[in-house]
Amino acid sequence: EPKIDYRADYEHEIPYDDPPAVVNAIYTSKVFKGVGEPDMNGFKATIMDLINRNYLKVETRTKGKTKRVFLKINKEKGLEDFEMYVMRFLRRFKKGDLIELDEIPKKLSKKRHARYFKDVYDKWKNSIKTKFLNKEKIGRIFINKGAKYMKVFGFIGVALAIIVAFLTIQDPLARLPFFASILLAITSIIAILLPEDIPGHWTREGREHIEKWKNFKKYLKDFSLIKEYPPESVEIWNKYLVYATALGIADNVIKAMKFQLPQQELEENDMYVFHDYGGYALLSSALATGMSTATEIEFDETVGDTGDIGDIGGGDMGGGGDAF
């Protein structure tokens, strides 16, 4: 890895003004997730960002001990294409003016709605990658040649292991090659599953970016650091919550907000209320259900064009600046 001059232990301010979904795509590492590949946390962070920027409003209803939370589309002008895909997905669940969050999990367990969600989700990902994460832009921060070689080695290793195991399984004199094939298969599968940033490497620019985002994540996860260096306003807290969602640690920031902010401010804050009334939990459950149902469908049958939402057109959708 290239050496950089950056030496800070943590970051208590957002390092760069990249869209939350872009931060999620580049600076979170998981099995099966490549660098520059947004995932479900990025999708949820996009929704949280739309709430924070007042494109979505949070409405609540209380009946006895029952609390219900809804989303309401407030405006759409000026959104990026990937944000418009999210709006189209949410609009599908409108009843009157309100989006009924507790109805989304039920609907996404059905094939028709799950197909639609998967189509939206794929188009959302592709829209982000086209605008912010094309090959040239990713190449400025990350070199994935090593990751490609590792995956090739992995697939060749699995194939070779299967062949050797097949040829030796019934030969009592070939126990050593048989067990060696099992070891090769395990090693090869690990090579295939490794996150890209382990065999690949960051450029100097990319290394500095990822170290700053890691340190910002460390700050958000450490309650003592937040207590020592708290955000200066509710608006900053809300922005931190958006990025925490992208980084997969939203619960840490919500807990810190409970301790640091007055109850009245919390009750007037759409971002906090969305979590407190269970809106975020409902959304997470719904999206997991939709993806699970869609995956089952893809295994069981060939998905046709039914439910295809089409591409977003031009019109009045504004364009933000490039990431990085």
Model-identified regions with their sequence ranges:
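Toprim catalytic domain recognition across nucleic-acid enzymes
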Residues: 1-26, 60-67
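Donor-sugar nucleotide-binding helix/loop cap in glycosyltransferases
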Residues: 26-157, 274-279
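Hydrophobic, membrane-inserted alpha-helices
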Residues: 155-165
